[in-house]
Design a protein with these regions (language model features):
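Class I SAM-dependent methyltransferase "Motif I" SAM/SAH-binding loop
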Residues: 5-9
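Class I SAM-dependent methyltransferase SAM/SAH-binding core
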Residues: 10, 14-60
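A conserved beta-strand element that flanks and buttresses the S-adenosyl-L-methionine
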Residues: 73
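Short catalytic micro-motifs in class I SAM-dependent methyltransferases
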Residues: 76-77
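A short glycine-rich, Lys/Arg-flanked "PGG" loop and its adjoining helix->strand segment in the class I
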Residues: 85-100
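Short alpha-helix
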Residues: 139-157, 163
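A C-terminal cap/extension of S-adenosyl-L-methionine-dependent methyltransferases
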Residues: 162-216
Length: 216
């Protein structure tokens, strides 16, 4: 598994604990340091399944041979890339035939939802005309449209196999709101999972999870 932009390693470590061989490709040296510390705290068997490389997800060809991975994850990264197509193509190149490319992106088709539901009408109106937005960190980033990414995936030989909505109901929750306790948490996750695979709800989710499969 290649995890591009693993951040603090929540996803990468979970996969390594499940027995997968995981390579993390991270551009931010601060995040690399945090992730190295997290890996060092794991048992030896898990540490042996983790490999960390400091590098840019747009330059996968400089680090890996074509067909090196069965799964490539790129979650929460494309919004920071001005032009996603070259990066997505590079990710697909390092996939083995039949391999899975998993993308998690901001949904440009629902970009007006959060500001609109919050009563921020100027931002909501602007979101209809531009995929650019300011995220919760105060950074200028961009969103992607599902149809556009689906066309990109088809063009690079990893056509879209399935897609889901993420954060249909919970996107307005503030970052400092405590995680619900059981049994509410289980009900919340069940509602999000159901909405994320059901029309029309998934189309207005804050994020899109797109799964492409590399042709043989």
């Amino acid at each position: 598994v290649l995890d591009v932009g693993p951040g603090q390693g929540t996803q990468a470590l979970r996969l390594a604990r499940l027995g997968h061989e995981v390579t993390g490709l991270e551009l931010d040296p601060r995040m690399i340091a945090v992730l190295r510390e997290a890996v060092a705290a794991e048992p030896e068997g898990i540490r042996e399944r983790m490999r960390l490389i400091e590098g840019d997800g747009r330059d996968t060809g400089a680090h890996f041979q074509p067909g090196s991975f069965d799964v490539v994850l790129c979650h929460g990264v494309l919004m920071y890339v001005p032009e996603p197509d070259p990066m997505v193509a590079g990710l697909a190149r390092v996939l083995a035939p039949g391999g899975l490319l998993s993308l998690l992106v901001r949904n440009a088709d629902a970009l007006a939802m959060r500001p609109g539901l919050s009563g921020d009408w100027d931002t909501a109106l602007a979101a209809f005309d531009s995929p650019a937005y300011t995220n919760r960190l105060g950074l200028q980033v961009r969103a992607d449209r599902r149809e556009t990414l689906a066309a990109t995936l088809a063009g690079i030989g990893a056509p879209l196999r399935a897609w889901y909505g993420v954060r249909v109901f919970t996107d307005l929750a503030e970052d400092d709101v405590p995680v619900p306790t059981e049994p509410e948490l289980t009900r919340l996750l069940a509602a999000e999972e159901r909405a994320g695979r059901t029309d029309p709800y998934r189309a207005v989710a804050a994020l899109l999870h797109l799964c492409g499969v590399r042709g043989g």
